[in-house]
């Protein structure tokens, strides 16, 4: 599937687990388009943030069941990607600068 670069990466994931991975091993977490491949994620992150990506690991997160009163619904499944950057590269969006 042909996705535009800005459509591949949806948003950064700012969680405690993602912060530990970023501090320990230069891994940054993103929510990405469900149909995006690892190669597309790598190209998108390199182009959007002007960094060199060494590795991309992806996982499909299951949507949670949600209730509103008696009605039961389900949030959709989504994909997250852990991106490892080259030594010395950082993404300012995560650094807070």
Curated annotation (Swiss-Prot):
Gene: rplW
GO molecular function, one term: rRNA binding
Task performed by this protein: One of the early assembly proteins it binds 23S rRNA. One of the proteins that surrounds the polypeptide exit tunnel on the outside of the ribosome. Forms the main docking site for trigger factor binding to the ribosome.
GO CC annotation terms, alphabetical: ribonucleoprotein complex; ribosome
One Gene Ontology biological process: translation
Signal sequence bounds: none
Coiled-coil residue windows: none
Species in which this protein is naturally found: Anaeromyxobacter dehalogenans (strain 2CP-C)
Quaternary structure note: Part of the 50S ribosomal subunit. Contacts protein L29, and trigger factor when it is bound to the ribosome.
Alphabetized UniProt keyword annotations: Ribonucleoprotein, Ribosomal protein, RNA-binding, rRNA-binding
Gene3D superfamilies per the UniProt record, alphabetical: 3.30.70.330
Family membership noted in the UniProt record: Belongs to the universal ribosomal protein uL23 family.
Classification via Pfam families: Ribosomal_L23
Cited InterPro entries: Nucleotide-bd_a/b_plait_sf (IPR012677), Ribosomal_uL23-like (IPR013025), Ribosomal_uL23/eL15/eS24_sf (IPR012678), Ribosomal_uL23_CS (IPR001014)
UniProt cross-references to SUPFAM superfamilies, sorted A to Z: Ribosomal proteins S24e, L23 and L15e
Protein name, as recorded: Large ribosomal subunit protein uL23
Keyword RNA-binding: yes
